[in-house]
Swiss-Prot record:
This is Chaperone protein DnaJ. It is found in: Cytoplasm. Belongs to the DnaJ family. Homodimer. SMART domains: DnaJ. SUPFAM superfamilies: Chaperone J-domain (SSF46565), DnaJ/Hsp40 cysteine-rich domain (SSF57938), HSP40/DnaJ peptide-binding domain (SSF49493). Residues 6-71 form the J domain.
Length: 396
C-alpha cells in the first residue's frame, strides 16, 4: 500500500495556511483533476480523491489539530481503514460521496462551468445533472484505556457498538417493496431545481435544493414498516480497531465509516476513539521518554553495584558506579516509547536519589561518626559547586 502524502503537500499550501487559502487550493486541485475534465483517467481520479481527503482534514479545525500533532495516525490510518474516508475505495467514499459532502465547494456535481472545459461541470450554479442529497450519519465516540505496554507495541481493541445501522427489511431505502418510491416529479430525480431571476444585468440562474424531495431525487410512497421510512434502525456492530504504537493520552483516532448509518443509504459517520493512558506503577511518561526514580542506599551509591530497573518489557540489571551522586541520570537508550509517526524510540531515564535512614542504632551511628571524621567524606569545592549549580537550575 502506497504511503500517504502529506496533506499540506497535496494541496501545495504551508502549515500556516488559512481556511480560505486551503479552500482556494483545493478548488484549484479539484478543477485540475475533476473527473468530467479527465474522463477515464484513473490517476487523475485518485488525485482528485487525494485532494478531497486532504481538504476534509485541513478545513476542519479539530481534524487539522490532530493531524498537525500526530500525522496521519491522528485522523485515519490508526483505525485500519486507510483514511478519514476509508481510503476512498472499497467500503470508503465514492465519487458521489465527495460531491455530496463538499457541495459548498462544487455547488453540486451538475452545476458550474458551461464553457471552457467542454462537458466539465461541478463548480457553481446552472447546468444539468444530478445533485441528489445523501444524508450523513452522526459520528460515534468511544474511549479506550491503554497500558504503557500496549502503547509500546500497538494493539487491536474490539468494541461492541450500539448504533444506527441500515434497515435490512428495505435495504436502507426507507421504502416498502420495490414500488415503494418514485422519481420526484418536480426535479425529475436530480435533487435540485434551477430558478430564473430577472436582474438589471439580465436573467440569472440559481440552483437550489428541490423543496419536494429535499434533494433526494425520490419520494417515498409507502414507508418501510420496520424503520418508518428512515432506512436505518437501532442495532449493534462489533468493530475491531487497530491502534498504532506511540499514541498518547488525549489523542483522538478516527475510523472512517464506522459511525451511525446515514438515512436512505446515506454516508455513514465516523468512529472517534479517545485514548486514555493507564498509570504505570513505576514508570512516568514524558512524551516518548520514560522516567524511573531510583532510590539507592548510601553504601550502594558509595561502593557501586548492580540494581534491577523496571522497564516496559520487564526488569533489567543496571550497573551503578562507585561514588554515584544524587541527581545523576542514567539513560537507557531505546527503552522508551516509539514515536506515533514511526520516527525513532524514546529512552528510559533513571533519576538517582540517595536514601537517608531516619533512625540509626548505636553501631551504625558509631560507624558514620568515624566516617564523618575522614576528609574523604567531606565534600570538595567542586562537588559543592555542582550541587549549587543543580539547585540553582531549578529556579532559572
Amino acid at each position: 500500500m502506497a504511503e500517504k502524502r502529506d496533506y499540506y503537500e497535496v494541496l501545495e499550501v504551508t502549515k500556516t495556511a488559512t481556511v480560505e487559502e486551503i479552500k482556494k487550493a483545493y478548488r484549484k486541485k479539484a478543477i485540475q483533476y475533476h473527473p468530467d475534465k479527465n474522463p477515464g483517467d484513473k490517476e487523475a481520479e485518485e488525485k482528485f480523491k487525494e485532494a478531497a481527503e486532504a481538504y476534509d482534514v485541513l478545513s476542519n479545525p479539530d481534524k487539522r489539530s490532530r493531524y498537525d500533532q500526530f500525522g496521519h495516525a491522528g485522523v485515519s490510518g490508526a483505525a485500519g481503514n486507510g483514511g478519514p474516508f476509508g481510503g476512498f475505495g472499497g467500503e470508503g467514499m465514492s465519487m458521489d460521496d465527495i460531491f455530496s459532502m463538499f457541495g459548498d465547494i462544487f455547488g453540486g456535481r451538475g452545476g458550474g462551468f458551461s464553457g471552457g472545459f467542454g462537458g466539465f461541470s461541478g463548480f457553481g450554479g446552472g447546468g444539468g445533472g444530478s445533485q441528489q442529497r445523501r444524508y450523513r450519519g452522526s459520528d460515534l465516540r468511544v474511549k479506550v484505556k491503554m497500558t504503557l505496554k500496549e502503547i509500546s507495541t500497538g494493539v487491536e481493541k474490539k468494541f461492541k457498538l450500539k448504533k444506527y445501522v441500515p434497515c435490512n427489511h428495505c435495504h436502507g431505502t426507507g421504502a416498502e417493496g420495490d414500488g415503494g418510491s418514485e422519481t420526484c416529479p418536480t426535479c425529475k430525480g436530480s435533487g435540485s431545481v434551477i430558478r430564473n431571476q430577472q436582474t438589471i444585468l439580465g436573467t440569472m440562474q440559481t440552483r437550489t435544493t428541490c423543496p419536494t424531495c429535499n434533494g433526494e431525487g425520490k419520494i417515498i410512497k409507502n414507508k418501510c414498516k420496520e424503520c418508518g421510512g428512515d432506512g436505518i434502525v437501532y442495532g449493534e456492530e462489533v468493530v475491531t480497531v487497530k491502534i498504532p504504537a506511540g499514541v498518547a493520552e488525549g489523542m483522538q483516532l478516527s475510523m472512517g465509516g464506522k459511525g451511525n448509518a446515514g438515512k436512505h443509504n446515506g454516508v455513514p459517520g465516523d468512529l472517534l476513539i479517545l485514548v486514555e493512558e493507564e498509570p504505570h506503577p513505576d514508570l512516568i511518561r514524558d512524551e516518548n521518554d520514560l522516567i524511573y526514580n531510583l532510590l539507592l542506599s548510601f553504601p550502594t551509591a558509595a561502593l557501586g553495584g548492580a540494581v534491577e530497573i523496571p522497564t516496559i518489557d520487564g526488569k533489567v540489571k543496571v550497573k551503578i558506579d562507585s561514588g554515584t551522586q544524587p541527581g545523576k541520570v542514567l539513560r537507557l537508550r531505546g527503552k522508551g516509547l516509539p514515536n506515533v509517526n514511526g520516527y525513532g524510540t524514546g529512552d528510559l531515564l533513571v533519576n538517582i536519589s540517595i536514601y537517608v535512614p531516619e533512625a540509626l542504632n548505636k553501631e551504625e551511628k558509631s560507624t558514620l561518626e568515624k566516617m564523618e571524621a575522614s576528609d574523604n567524606f567531606k565534600p570538595s569545592t567542586s562537588v559543592k559547586e555542582k550541587i549549587f549549580k543543580k539547585f540553582k537550575s531549578f529556579f532559572d
